[in-house]
Amino acid sequence: MSSDSNAKPLPFIYQFISGAVAGISELTVMYPLDVVKTRFQLEVTTPTAAAVGKQVERYNGVIDCLKKIVKKEGFSRLYRGISSPMLMEAPKRATKFACNDQYQKIFKNLFNTNETTQKISIAAGASAGMTEAAVIVPFELIKIRMQDVKSSYLGPMDCLKKTIKNEGIMGLYKGIESTMWRNALWNGGYFGVIYQVRNSMPVAKTKGQKTRNDLIAGAIGGTVGTMLNTPFDVVKSRIQSVDAVSSAVKKYNWCLPSLLVIYREEGFRALYKGFVPKVCRLAPGGSLMLVVFTGMMNFFRDLKYGH
């Protein structure tokens, strides 16, 4: 996403690198909250959950979850499975930002306008999210299975090998539909809100003011995106966590039917399991990504065009 509508354009490779650096920066700082989010989302709260072996540990909040993980499993567990999203992060975030810029150009041509409107920002963001989903699904599946409290995999490569052996190559794409829904809604909300917030704030005249505006816009965008996509993220986690050899009941398949199953069995609140750690990660994470991405783009712009 361009940090300034009047800024000189940069080739795709610069957008790709800027997005990759932004994503890896956010992941390194915020990953423990992603582990907490997954633990909450995989908690099944039906009366029969314990009987089918789904309820292993109950957590009473983000801090309680962090404490229990460190106490019972060790500090390193907070970063268990990070190698998979770390490998994913560069193409994921690069796709998010670079494809968003490319889709903006496509929609501007489609609607015969030179202006980036909020509708174009939302459409471009959602389209970039769906493209991003196709890239990240295998990495997401490995990450979810590694983060699960019941995980017995020796590492990401062990998880990858066993998944392919037991479920085939296509098993790595389990949950792609829910991932596309999740990413389209988050990206559409994130980029749409960033556009609106930036236009509503006083024009930044200094680098410090631009950074402030990006921090605020990114935080609000990350929060709105999280509110929109959390139910689909819960479904994605449930679908991807169950492997082919598991004894768990396989009742989560397609996205929308799974939403109804969770709602009927556990209530509306279950669709927002993990919302607090998720928003605690993605609100400041959204700010961090936007600031780093904008900073990297400005750095490359200075290199290419001079001050």
Curated annotation (Swiss-Prot):
Location in the cell: Mitochondrion inner membrane
Solcar repeat windows: 10-106, 116-200, 209-299
GO terms for MF: ATP:ADP antiporter activity; dicarboxylic acid transmembrane transporter activity; L-aspartate transmembrane transporter activity; L-glutamate transmembrane transporter activity
InterPro entries, sorted: ADT_euk_type, Mit_carrier, Mito_2-oxodicarb_carrier, Mitochondrial_sb/sol_carrier, Mt_carrier_dom_sf
Pfam families xrefs: Mito_carr (PF00153)
Gene3D superfamilies cross-referenced by the UniProt entry: Mitochondrial carrier domain (1.50.40.10)
Family: Belongs to the mitochondrial carrier (TC 2.A.29) family.
Protein name, entry field: Mitochondrial 2-oxodicarboxylate carrier 2
Source organism: Saccharomyces cerevisiae (strain ATCC 204508 / S288c) (Baker's yeast)
Record gene name: ODC2
